[in-house]
From Swiss-Prot:
Designated gene of the protein: pgk
Family, per entry: Belongs to the phosphoglycerate kinase family.
Pathway info: Carbohydrate degradation; glycolysis; pyruvate from D-glyceraldehyde 3-phosphate: step 2/5
One Pfam assignment: PGK
Molecular function terms, GO-annotated: ADP binding; ATP binding; phosphoglycerate kinase activity
Assembly, per entry: Monomer.
UniProt-annotated binding residues for ATP: 205, 322, 348-351
Catalysed reaction, written as an equation: (2R)-3-phosphoglycerate + ATP = (2R)-3-phospho-glyceroyl phosphate + ADP
Location(s) in or outside the cell: Cytoplasm
Sorted UniProt keywords: ATP-binding, Cytoplasm, Glycolysis, Kinase, Nucleotide-binding, Transferase
Organism: Solibacter usitatus (strain Ellin6076)
GO cellular component: cytosol
Entry protein name: Phosphoglycerate kinase
HAMAP family linked to this entry: Phosphoglyc_kinase
Amino acid sequence: MSYLSIRDLDLKGKRVFIRVDFNVPLQKNDQGAMEITSDKRIKASLPTIQYALEHGAAVILASHLGRPKGKPNTEMSLKPVAARLEQVLKVPVKMAPDCVGPEVQAMLPAPGEVLLLENLRFHAEEEKNDPAFAAQLAALCEIYVNDAFGSAHRAHASTEGMVKLVKQAAAGLLMEKELKYLGMATTNPPRPCVAILGGAKVSDKIEVIQNLGKVVDRLLIGGAMAYTFLKAQGLPTGKSLVEDDKVELAKSLLAELGERLMLPVDHVVVSEIAAGAPFEVVDTIPEGKIAVDIGPKTVEAFSKVVAGAKTVIWNGPMGIFEKPPFDQGTVAVAKAVAGSGATSIVGGGDSEKAIKAAGVSDKISHVSTGGGASLEFLAGDTLPGVAALDR
């Protein structure tokens, strides 16, 4: 697949529509107004917006926020985003009352100006990829740039439908970075290449395991999904989370991957999952106990493999990360990945939180901004938002 970068285009004097990911977390403050609790996604879009402005573009920004079910909802307005963007961009940001229609047409920016459209999902046509709605969006601009990797797995009007209707389309700088790192990891990674997968369910990551199994030298599995594999090996799992309907699949994956697949060799177990619950470390999960994290022997074994890697792909926690002290395995893995010196690609909210908790964010090569999109990419799926840029 070949696509253009925003850097390949002449933006001077052109209206450039940038599809960004401003799906930020909001909460009501004491005055009842919605405020942003994390502006990470806004800041992630700044390089592309600044590049467009520096090269003489009139910038139109578009995003969804939340799930307003196809109608306006003041609690999911992008107005707080416009205010925050203006602060961090240090350029005035006009806020449109809608994303299409005569009012928006009347507000179209001049070169050097920024207009933020209202939430795309206030129109049901966005998620339906409605051709007429896509045409209205396309009519706003001359150049289309997709910088919303987190929405690239959706075939919506703003990510796919309108792209065919514009004169030129390209990837933004953030999108380009995502595709560079994830593409390298899944096609031609520096070796040894190690993948670490965690999280609760095998069913969420079957395709990822199968696809990465073709590429990686070692695949380390932690989190609750490991217990389905342990059961497939005939080992006791106590009351740990097991997907019984996936045990046969786990058996076939074990046979296929052989010694390349590594599972936990010890476990942190509890009688009940509760804050402050007493725990013990065991090699074999006893009857009636629930495994909630990988144990120290597993941390050591996983860390040793990671230390010798040239590429590390990590997605998903090693235990019940949100309930300390059962976050220790995940934090230890974060430190191992950061200390490896390998090209490291991390995805998934808990893995990202673990990197922060371990204080090693600056030592990770790339933290993916797309949850579902990065998983689908790792699974080898075609992302509609990326395929639409193919030229």
